Amino acid sequence: MRAVVQRVTRARVTVEGEVVGAVDGPGLLVLLGVTHDDGPAQVELIARKVAQLRILRGERAAADVGAPVLLVSQFTLYADTRKGRRPTWNAAAPGDVAQPLVDAVADALRGHGLPVETGRFGADMAVELVNDGPTTILLDA
């Protein structure tokens, strides 16, 4: 499981002109990719890392202040660009495997006391954000 975690002042996801998820105020935008061998252990590890990562102002973690999280599934985090100019996504888990794990990460983050909004799995989404810092961290679990 791979996550790109961005500290944001605001972020939102739009599908076909409709806002399906948004955070206002200091929080995190998490782009999440799932690979074939991910399971419950990776769900718990990535959720704990996101919740406890001290990247908010004042060296605080999202769990310390109840910061909102916008979680967006993104299979392209597992792009393989080693050959040619066209990436492949063979390392990304198929939707029927990935979707329940993305949902489980959202639930695990809520279990850490965080308000969580999400994108729409499998949809063509427009993600808008204001990166604060900018601060962007790559996590692997």
Swiss-Prot record:
Keywords: Cytoplasm, Hydrolase, RNA-binding, tRNA-binding. GO terms for biological process: D-amino acid catabolic process. It comes from Kineococcus radiotolerans (strain ATCC BAA-149 / DSM 14245 / SRS30216). The gene is dtd. A motif (Gly-cisPro motif, important for rejection of L-amino acids) lies at residues 133-134. Its EC number is 3.1.1.96. An aminoacyl-tRNA editing enzyme that deacylates mischarged D-aminoacyl-tRNAs. Also deacylates mischarged glycyl-tRNA(Ala), protecting cells against glycine mischarging by AlaRS. Acts via tRNA-based rather than protein-based catalysis; rejects L-amino acids rather than detecting D-amino acids in the active site. By recycling D-aminoacyl-tRNA to D-amino acids and free tRNA molecules, this enzyme counteracts the toxicity associated with the formation of D-aminoacyl-tRNA entities in vivo and helps enforce protein L-homochirality. The keyword Cell cycle does not apply. Its main location: cytoplasm. The keyword Nucleus does not apply. It is an enzyme of class 3 (hydrolase). It catalyses: glycyl-tRNA(Ala) + H2O = tRNA(Ala) + glycine + H(+); a D-aminoacyl-tRNA + H2O = a tRNA + a D-alpha-amino acid + H(+). Belongs to the DTD family. GO terms for molecular function: D-tyrosyl-tRNA(Tyr) deacylase activity; Gly-tRNA(Ala) deacylase activity; Ser(Gly)-tRNA(Ala) hydrolase activity; tRNA binding. A Gly-cisPro motif from one monomer fits into the active site of the other monomer to allow specific chiral rejection of L-amino acids. This is D-aminoacyl-tRNA deacylase. Homodimer. It is found in: Cytoplasm. GO terms for cellular component: cytoplasm. NCBIfam families: D-aminoacyl-tRNA deacylase. It comes from the Bacteria.
